[in-house]
Amino acid sequence: MTLLTQSSTWQALSAHSKNVPHMRELFATDTARFNKMSLSACGLLLDYSKNRATAETLDLLFALASNSQLEAKIKAMFAGEIINTTEKRAVLHTALRSTAEQSIIAEGQDIVPEVQQTLNKMQGFVSSVTSGQWKGYTGKAITDIVSIGIGGSFLGPKIVSQALRPYWNPELKCHFVANVDGTSISEKLKLLDPETTLFIMSSKSFGTQETLTNTLTAREWFLAKGGLQSDVAKHFVAVTSNVAKATDFGIDADNIFPMWDWVGGRYSLWSAIGLPIALLIGMDNFRALLSGAHQMDEHFANAPLTENMPVIMGLLSLWYGNFFNAQSNVVLTYDHYLRGLPAYFQQLDMESNGKSVTLNGTAVDYSTGPVIWGGEGTNGQHAYHQLLHQGTALIPADFIMPLQSHNPIGEHHDQLASNCFGQTQALMQGRTFDEALAELANSALSATEKQLIAKHKVMPGNKPSNTLLMDKLTPSTLGALIALYEHRTFVQGAIWDINSFDQWGVELGKDLGNDVLTRIGASQDCDALDASSNALINLYRQGKI
């Protein structure tokens, strides 16, 4: 057993998990449960009353956090200490949304001035493009932005841009390309005019395979459509640390935006990686996005554990994963603009906490990162919600909804909200056999049939959920929401004593993929790998099965 699972608090939680009453009983015996188990911060309200948790549960979870030195670990992250120990890096995505008055030291120097300088550079660039001052090679203004990246440099900008669609500049359209599948970029290029298209290449090394391949294809298309190599600088900019490679490509050094080692890809949307977002919604709104995240940073850093929204959410998820064998969490967004958030949170959580050894290399003997999945309501109610209600797996759910819609049409939003709240209630209380039987009392079924159908209509309830509300989806509330999930992920990793900021599983896939690519291009069939890999590579080389 590890030190964590040997601890008295862990053992107490394990014993306690077997004695928590059904949530029906918890609500029946405490009419003030919502008031006791809800919290507002940074424009968000968290209702966590529909959880399998009592005051004793929370006390034990907070004790687990304290015993795991969570508060000290939070301070260490904000202070710029080397908490990504395997890569010997600080973790300071929070510095990207700091205020100009702050001082944050990384590797012996204050990084805030450079962050502010980059934001100011972004401001000038955004102004140039959106005002029409930036011209393409034929003198026309830019109408289309193509953001080329992969992982965090793709998913963050795409999902945030999608979420903030009501704030878009109507004169601009943005397209996102990530997959190395040629179909992805080909379908985008079919829509574009090279004279009015601007490409943003986002890669720290300017050598990420998928991103570089897509960028080279974009340049070939641009040149084939009439542009010259000398015109590339008017249509390509980069977010990278490798200035030399970017300038060799044809990008003007003045149009290269920095990346830093202390920002991981899945936390990078707050940096110049967010340039597509800034172009679409303007720098004032982009700064509001940063401000909302900064407010959540301040809350996370300063609120006591018992009143700390990311801490509470992280602990509850850990509670189900480690003591109820919950293998996944579902994120359900009751707002069409937020439909991409489950995929974003999936990358954030699973790439961060999909680890199996502690910081000192000891194999864990407890579950770590759960599978994160989900979708938008009410679509999911006609699909996978069935499994949530009557399936055998326990799947904690997060419901996310703005109280006000950007598109208030008739009763649409009232119906959306009623479905959202109704689902949380149904998951919590379920339906007993007697209730199901009573509903069938006036049906034409026989007594035997009623008994049978009633059994099929039983729902156990006691299925946990959180509900997150905001007044309206704005850049600020979205920033706070994303930062909330970033810190929730940190909380769990800190207690599990794992490194939430490396991704060696991703790196292995890259290495083996490059090796296979070499073998695909070889002059002879492959026979040096395992039988399956040899056969698959050789079938691909033949081009048919």
Swiss-Prot record:
UniProt cross-references to PROSITE patterns, sorted A to Z: P_GLUCOSE_ISOMERASE_1, P_GLUCOSE_ISOMERASE_2, P_GLUCOSE_ISOMERASE_3
InterPro entries linked: G6P_Isomerase, G6P_Isomerase_C, Phosphoglucose_isomerase_CS, SIS_dom_sf, SIS_PGI_1, SIS_PGI_2
Gene Ontology CC entries for this record: cytosol
GO biological process, one term: glucose 6-phosphate metabolic process
Catalysis: reaction(s): alpha-D-glucose 6-phosphate = beta-D-fructose 6-phosphate
CDD domains assigned: SIS_PGI_1, SIS_PGI_2
GO molecular function: carbohydrate derivative binding; glucose-6-phosphate isomerase activity; monosaccharide binding
EC number: 5.3.1.9
Pathway: Carbohydrate biosynthesis; gluconeogenesis; Carbohydrate degradation; glycolysis; D-glyceraldehyde 3-phosphate and glycerone phosphate from D-glucose: step 2/4
Location relative to the cell: Cytoplasm
Gene3D superfamilies documented for this protein: 1.10.1390.10, Glucose-6-phosphate isomerase like protein, domain 1
Keyword Cytoplasm found: yes
Keywords, comma-separated and alphabetical: Cytoplasm, Gluconeogenesis, Glycolysis, Isomerase
Catalytic center residues: E351, H382, K510
Described purpose of this protein according to its UniProt entry: Catalyzes the reversible isomerization of glucose-6-phosphate to fructose-6-phosphate.
Family: Belongs to the GPI family.
Protein name: Glucose-6-phosphate isomerase
Lineage of source species: Bacteria, Pseudomonadati, Pseudomonadota, Gammaproteobacteria, Alteromonadales
Name of the encoding gene: pgi
